[in-house]
């Protein structure tokens, strides 16, 4: 298990979520970053590796929590499913992140579903064992609290944007987020290297795939973007977002 844990520890992780704050539009240090070798070894001792193919569930909404899953490879999508069947994507999480909050010690029902968006490898850490480690090591406890605080800020920002921003503003904000975190400058363009479908973007902003397709086509006609997704004029997307 050590190689996978080492990769998660050494990587700079980032998620994808709906946010407009510059404090959230940045790579996120992995859960294990900053921990001593001894604390990393303690976490390795309680962990069990799990491999998932694309589309396989980590858990379903309503399942009883049993612990957290540290992502070693791949991409995990967390989403809420309404009784109507409509889904709202909360975030995509990458290596170095964990999924399984907010009840990380495993005593309540999961509030949303998490699924592998691509082939992924995770390390499962049982809640009771994780609680014991948090009581024994203040550094581990603080690392868990910091990660939970970041997730809380992400979900709070998402709720604020869904409630106060138009769907067009949310799309523009998401494109700005992707450009800041996953964009690579090539000449006068910013090329977003992460592959996301129109459906992925729609789920993140609370819209439909058809609407996103129409809006991206319009932005392309206006010379703001070029598929896939190359941002030509970042300032235009930011107009009116203050």
Language-model region placement:
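Cyclic nucleotide-binding regulatory domains
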Residues: 31, 56-119
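Cyclic-nucleotide recognition modules
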Residues: 39, 91-153, 157
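A residue-level structural signature of the nucleotidyltransferase/glycosyltransferase Rossmann-like core
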Residues: 68, 90, 122-123, 193, ...
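Polybasic "coupling" helices that flank or enter modular domains
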Residues: 135-206
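Phosphate-/nucleic-acid-contacting segments
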Residues: 180-242
């Amino acid at each position: 298990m050590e190689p996978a844990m080492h990769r998660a520890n050494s990587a700079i992780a980032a998620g994808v979520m709906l946010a407009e704050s510059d404090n959230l539009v940045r790579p996120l240090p992995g859960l294990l970053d900053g921990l001593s070798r001894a604390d990393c070894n303690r976490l390795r001792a309680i962990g069990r590796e799990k491999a998932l193919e694309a589309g396989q569930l980590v858990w379903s909404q309503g399942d009883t929590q049993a612990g957290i899953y540290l992502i070693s490879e791949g991409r995990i999508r967390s989403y809420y499913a309404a009784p109507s069947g409509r889904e709202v994507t909360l975030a995509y999480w990458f290596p170095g992140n964990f999924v399984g909050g907010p009840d990380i010690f495993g005593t309540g029902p999961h509030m949303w579903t998490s699924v592998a968006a691509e082939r992924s490898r995770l390390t499962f850490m049982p809640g009771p064992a994780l609680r014991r480690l948090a009581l024994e090591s203040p550094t581990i406890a603080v690392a868990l609290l910091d990660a939970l605080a970041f997730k809380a800020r992400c979900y709070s920002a998402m709720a604020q944007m869904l409630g106060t921003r138009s769907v067009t503003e949310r799309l523009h904000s998401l494109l700005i987020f992707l450009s800041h975190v996953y964009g690579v400058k090539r000449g006068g363009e910013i090329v977003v290297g992460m592959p996301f479908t129109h459906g992925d973007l729609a789920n993140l902003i609370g819209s439909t795939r058809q609407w996103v397709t129409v809006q991206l086509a319009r932005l392309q006609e206006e010379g703001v973007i070029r598929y896939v997704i190359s941002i030509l004029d970042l300032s235009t997307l930011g107009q009116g977002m203050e």
